[in-house]
Amino acid sequence: MIIPAEKRRRGSRLATAAAVLLFTIGCTATGFALWGNPPPPRPPASAAVSAPSPESVSATPLPEPISVPPTPRVDQVVGPTLTASEPTQINVPAIEVDSVLMQLGQNPDGTVQTPSLDEASPAGWYTGSPTPGAIGPSVIVGHVDSRVQGRAVFYRLGEMRPGDEILVTRADATVAVFVVDGVEEYPKDDFPQFAVYGNTDHAGLRLITCGGEFNEITRTYPDNVVVYASLVSSRAA
């Protein structure tokens, strides 16, 4: 259910960056599964989202906890929000993604867990972030490739453009409808934690996967592709 502004609680859940040492989504991927296939699509500069001077933090060594802005006051919240409910499925028509969502926690080194490389799907919701539709940036991650099926669930994430819809089905039988604000590709060693994980004044969503040219020597992708989206409405599942 959408919460009217006057009923939104001041003490909303802190964004991901407030609680844990997050920096990038792990990009030690298979690569070999894409041999003979073109590299994953990359977002053009025109698809970039504007962010006010985000703080960039090195991925290695582990960064110190970063500071986040105060949780927005009730009268500062922008747009609709939903009561908390865990996500169960994601649908992205523009890139033909329809995936159940697993739950992902945190690795000992502070990085976000990722789905198994042995499967192209599913994507996963990071449980340390708000549920989709709540105030703050909800985080959903997925692989770009896999060991057994080549292209994985977020292989085409770089194709997304502002205005594309993202539909997230939740456990309370509602569908949260998000619209893409922008798409960015960041080097792992210059990842803007504040812009991606910091508190927001609206119900946001981040879709994240690996990106850039696969390095045959290190067997890794050097970048992360991040899709920024905002909640615009909800409906019954």
Predicted regions and their residues:
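Terminal targeting segments of Actinobacterial cell-envelope proteins
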Residues: M1-A15, P40-R42
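Hydrophobic membrane-insertion alpha-helices, especially the h-region
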Residues: A17-F32
